[in-house]
Amino acid sequence: MFSRDLTLARYDAELFAAMKQEAQRQEDHIELIASENYTSPAVMEAQGSVLTNKYAEGYPGKRYYGGCEYVDIVEQLAIDRAKQLFGADYANVQPHAGSQANAAVYQALVKPGDTVLGMSLAHGGHLTHGASVNFSGKMYNAVQYGIDANGFIDYDEVERLALEHKPKMIVAGYSAYSQVLDFARFREIADKVGAYLFVDMAHFAGLVAAGVYPNPVPFADVVTTTTHKTLRGPRGGLILAKANEEIEKKLNSAVFPGGQGGPLEHVIAAKAVCFKEALQPDFKEYQQQVVKNAKAMAQVFIERGFDVVSGGTENHLFLVSLIKQEITGKDADAALGRAFITVNKNSVPNDPRSPFVTSGLRIGTPAVTTRGFKETECRELAGWICDILVDLNNEAVVDGVREKVQAICARFPVYGK
């Protein structure tokens, strides 16, 4: 029998110490990685619950194991809330992550060797959109589109590639693109060549849920997302679709038994909490502020003489090119890290450097907005970053910014008392 008095701190002090250090790092550092956010205590409570003990292969009402009557309730709540949140007729909440959700879509809709048209990783796409190092680029004939000289998707080029290569599926979505996607145009192009339209909204799902970014569900055959990032839930995946019995069956089979075994019901419970949070009125205010903060930060970089890819942002992130400054993304990332500002180096269009070095930074505002930052704080923060970037090897500047970061983090804690 387990004793509830035997806490992690008492049982495994070494592990607990590392976890405490990470908790302190999150409080003391400013998080600007666009794919990161902070979850609520309620989400973490669900994820750390006894639901982790239950195996539940199958779907609600159709399980292979007994004793699933209560996890059925949990999973159905998550399904119903996801459908309500995004206006979908179908939802599968079982994918362990976004990449697994995407893999299920490939397995359901296309066959190995089929042509798939997706956004190039070098231009802002994702590994699972046809990158040569990923299953999507190894198992399928991946054709890639990108952005034009101004940093925008060239839809005429997408159409030209589609007409030339006749893909079975077109992928819309990104990991580093700061503008709004034209889902109607993607749908039009897909229809011209008889392709499925698959939208990966992992980065902007929270914005969609709040109505501050167009909803791809009415346009796409299938939509996937992660449940963290802008959605602010646990790390996991989600598949959505309009009513289509054939596609729904294929998707369910591709997730289980095609790609996964038992679902993580404790994570699914946390997803249900996240969806409930996203249905509240204050979630829309939060997402509106995320975009305002990103716009405010991008404008400071422009005013300070930095090149922002596509000239600004219409979502939660933007890319700063450092080619003109002759700075590498790797060095900029490291210097900002010493100031307790966490960003990620990122390739920019026509980047002369390798993906391990890069010539840019990707900056996102979901996490700082969760802390309570508004435009004033974000403009100030962007100024501090610029101060470091224009004098990268000046440790006195880094030290001064770090003191300011610690002070503002104390004013805006992640988790209050």
UniProtKB/Swiss-Prot annotation:
CDD domains: SHMT. InterPro entries: PyrdxlP-dep_Trfase (IPR015424), PyrdxlP-dep_Trfase_major (IPR015421), PyrdxlP-dep_Trfase_small (IPR015422), Ser_HO-MeTrfase (IPR001085), Ser_HO-MeTrfase-like (IPR049943), Ser_HO-MeTrfase_PLP_BS (IPR019798), SHMT-like_dom (IPR039429). It is an enzyme of class 2 (transferase). Its cofactor is pyridoxal 5'-phosphate. The modification N6-(pyridoxal phosphate)lysine is found at residue 229. It is found in: Cytoplasm. Its EC number is 2.1.2.1. One of its GO terms (molecular function) is pyridoxal phosphate binding. Keywords: Amino-acid biosynthesis, Cytoplasm, One-carbon metabolism, Pyridoxal phosphate, Transferase. Pathway: One-carbon metabolism; tetrahydrofolate interconversion; Amino-acid biosynthesis; glycine biosynthesis; glycine from L-serine: step 1/1. It catalyses: (6R)-5,10-methylene-5,6,7,8-tetrahydrofolate + glycine + H2O = (6S)-5,6,7,8-tetrahydrofolate + L-serine. GO terms for biological process: glycine biosynthetic process from serine; tetrahydrofolate interconversion. (6S)-5,6,7,8-tetrahydrofolate binds at residues 121, 125-127, 354-356. Gene3D superfamilies: Aspartate Aminotransferase, domain 1, Type I PLP-dependent aspartate aminotransferase-like (Major domain). GO terms for cellular component: cytosol. The record marks 228 as: Plays an important role in substrate specificity. PROSITE patterns: SHMT (PS00096). Homodimer. Belongs to the SHMT family. Catalyzes the reversible interconversion of serine and glycine with tetrahydrofolate (THF) serving as the one-carbon carrier. This reaction serves as the major source of one-carbon groups required for the biosynthesis of purines, thymidylate, methionine, and other important biomolecules. Also exhibits THF-independent aldolase activity toward beta-hydroxyamino acids, producing glycine and aldehydes, via a retro-aldol mechanism. This is Serine hydroxymethyltransferase. It comes from Azotobacter vinelandii (strain DJ / ATCC BAA-1303).
